[in-house]
């Protein structure tokens, strides 16, 4: 009996959310809205720019690298603005430029992101700070720059591109994972600062996207544990999902692919089960084959081989100690040593 009741409750809740999405707040209007995308010169950002341009919207891209006309990353019709989004002064200065030359930005897509793929102790302070500035702090800068205009015209949409790794971060992604977790928290706080989502009088909506692994250079070399359960996502497909969401005025969160909806639950289960999930999914060791966004590939490969050699050497040494101790124990001359798994890292 409980099954049909829960099914009915789920359907009624979904119907309510769909009605509220269409009834309250804005719907995307390409003739009226100006879209600004950070990190829009490549990867997902470039596909988002292409999608909105194809719908006849006005699109501005903030990126530290501006693609040359005629190259693969260049999208005809996009207004490219060279801007280091990790630099607060540049963001505020270029926001004023866009305001004066293009118009009032009513859709902000915070997409810029970088990663280093190193152990925390191997990260320099500059690399840590740069990752947090580009991935997290830049969203604070752009929201501070453009949200007042949205509130003034009672029309706006702020889309935050986070990641499933903001819920479950692997080793060697401490700064990246922390930045994506921060984006999720930023989205939640901002959403309720703007008012109750279903009866929002500010006119500004928020949307959070938490995709799985994208098929881009950022995570080049990182294998996916299953092409069926955890497939690499095509940026073009993700951009289409984002456009479809804003077209119908969606708010809340989008987690793709399917496993993205399960990842947050891992944090609430007993740790042995969570550890088993990490092991079976391969997430704990996934970044060992990372080659994207690095100029130290040779050094990292050498370092990985050195680490492996050290571990093997230590295991052999431990095995020898145990063998000697067993022999001595048989003769009753010594106790067996206690070996902690923490001795081998």
Label the predicted regions.
Residues 111-116:
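Conserved NAD(P)H cofactor-binding loop of Rossmann-fold oxidoreductase domains
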Residues 143, 179:
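Active-site helix of classical SDR
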Residues 83-93, 125:
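The beta1-alpha1 cofactor-binding region of Rossmann-like NAD(H)/NADP(H)-dependent oxidoreductases
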């Amino acid at each position: 009996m409980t099954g049909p009741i829960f099914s009915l409750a789920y359907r009624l809740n979904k119907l309510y959310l769909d009605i509220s999405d269409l009834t309250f707040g804005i719907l995307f209007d390409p003739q009226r809205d100006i879209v600004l995308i950070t990190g829009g010169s490549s990867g997902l950002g470039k596909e988002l720019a292409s999608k909105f341009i194809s719908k006849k919207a006005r699109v501005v891209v903030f990126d530290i690298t501006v693609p040359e006309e005629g190259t693969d990353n260049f999208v005809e019709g996009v207004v490219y603005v060279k801007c280091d989004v990790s630099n607060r002064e540049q963001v505020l200065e270029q926001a004023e430029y866009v305001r004066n030359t293009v118009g009032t930005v009513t859709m902000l897509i915070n997409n810029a992101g970088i990663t280093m793929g190193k152990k925390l102790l191997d990260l320099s302070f500059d690399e840590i700070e740069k990752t947090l500035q580009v991935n997290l702090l830049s969203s604070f800068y752009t929201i501070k720059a453009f949200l007042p205009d949205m509130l003034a015209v009672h029309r706006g949409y702020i889309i935050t591109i986070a990641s499933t790794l903001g819920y479950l971060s692997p080793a060697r992604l401490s700064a990246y994972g922390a930045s994506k977790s921060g984006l999720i928290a930023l989205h939640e706080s901002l959403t309720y600062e703007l008012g109750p989502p279903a009866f929002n009088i500010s006119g500004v909506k928020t949307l959070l996207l938490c995709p799985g692994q994208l098929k881009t250079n950022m995570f080049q070399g990182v294998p996916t544990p299953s092409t069926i359960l955890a497939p690499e996502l095509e940026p073009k497909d993700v951009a289409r999902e984002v456009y479809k969401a804003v077209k119908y005025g969606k708010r809340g969160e989008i987690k793709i692919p399917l496993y993205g909806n399960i990842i947050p639950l891992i944090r609430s289960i007993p740790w042995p089960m969570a550890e088993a999930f990490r092991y079976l999914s391969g997430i704990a060791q996934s970044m060992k084959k990372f080659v994207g966004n690095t100029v130290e590939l040779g050094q990292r490969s050498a370092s990985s081989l050195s680490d492996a050699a050290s571990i093997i050497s230590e295991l052999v040494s431990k095995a020898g100690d145990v063998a000697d101790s067993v022999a001595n124990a048989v003769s009753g001359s010594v106790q067996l040593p206690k070996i902690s798994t923490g001795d081998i890292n």
